[in-house]
Amino acid sequence: MASRQDRREARAEADARRAAEEIARARDERVMQAEVDARSAADEIARARADRGAATMGADTAHHAAGGGGILESVQEGAKSFVSAVGRTFGGARDTAAEKTSQTADATRDKLGEYKDYTADKARETNDSVARKTNETADASRDKLGEYKDYTADKTRETKDAVAQKASDASEATKNKLGEYKDALARKTRDAKDTTAQKATEFKDGVKATAQETRDATADTARKAKDATKDTTQTAADKARETAATHDDATDKGQGQGLLGALGNVTGAIKEKLTVSPAATQEHLGGGEERAVKERAAEKAASVYFEEKDRLTRERAAERVDKCVEKCVEGCPDATCAHRHGKM
């Protein structure tokens, strides 16, 4: 705003300077024209005076050179009269020219004085007008500047108030949103905790029930496996005894199937005990633990079978040797007799 006022004042000063220069140029032109007119009039006066002086000097010379008497004197008198007339004529012209020159000079001085007064008045009026315009412009600028300052201050206050109101509203909204968010978060946290606790309790109860069921099933499976193992072992022992008895009878009669047949019978018995046949197809008991139990039962049954077989074999061999010794003196003709091979 200050720069705008400065520009306006500078323009006003420039306009005032241009007006003063125009006035000075006009005054100089008029003064120069008056001076030219005065010089022309002076030149006319000087020429008229020179002409008149030359005529007077010619008349005096003619008067002194002429002699007296007669026609010559008459001529001289006529010439003198003519010169006098000319002199009077030129004197009137000179007076008229001098008067005209004086009048012209006076008129020129008057015009110049009037022009100077006019120029001074115009300059004063121009200066007064410029000063008045400058003052009015300065006053208007100050008023505008004051109004603009007041307007700017009002707008600034309004803007500050609006910004403060917006900030307060935003702060309140943020606080409300934050409170709502905190409440929602706390509610969600409580719900999550309750759900987690409930899920944990349910999971714990489920795990406990599952563990109990697993323990019960394991115990039941172990009992079943133990019973099955016991039955299998007993059955294997019975089969072993039956097989041994059958083998002995077959050996005595020469109709037995041998050790491989007996082993196959015992193996079939163990396999039959370790499988369940509710229908036409065999269904093995499931589960890794059950399978391991069945394998251990089969191994134990096989061990019992082989132990029982070895015991029975040793008993039967001892019985055969005793029978062989009782029947023959030099030795048993049977190729399996132990004492024929130096084993006695």
UniProtKB/Swiss-Prot annotation:
Ranges where the record places region Disordered? 1-20, 116-258
Is Nucleus one of the keywords?
Answer: yes
For bias type Basic and acidic residues, the affected ranges are 116-163, 172-230, 238-252
Gene3D superfamilies from the UniProt entry: 6.10.140.1430
Q: Which UniProt keywords apply?
A: Coiled coil, Nucleus, Stress response
Task: Tell where it localizes.
Answer: Nucleus
Q: What domain of life is recorded for the organism?
A: Eukaryota
Q: In this entry, which stretches build a coiled coil?
A: 3-52
Induction details? Induced by abscisic acid (ABA), salt stress and dehydration.
Q: In which tissues is it expressed?
A: Expressed in embryos.
Q: Return one Gene Ontology term, BP aspect.
A: cold acclimation
Query: Gene Ontology terms, cellular component aspect?
Result: nucleus
Q: What is its main location?
A: nucleus
Fill in the misc note. Plants overexpressing LEA17 display enhanced tolerance to salt stress, drought stress and osmotic shock.
Family per record: Belongs to the LEA type 4 family.
| Protein function | Involved in abiotic stress responses. May function as chaperone and contribute to prevent the formation of damaging protein aggregates.
PANTHER family per UniProt: LATE EMBRYOGENESIS ABUNDANT DOMAIN-CONTAINING PROTEIN / LEA DOMAIN-CONTAINING PROTEIN, LATE EMBRYOGENESIS ABUNDANT PROTEIN 17
Listed name of the protein: Late embryogenesis abundant protein 17
Organism for this UniProt entry: Oryza sativa subsp. japonica
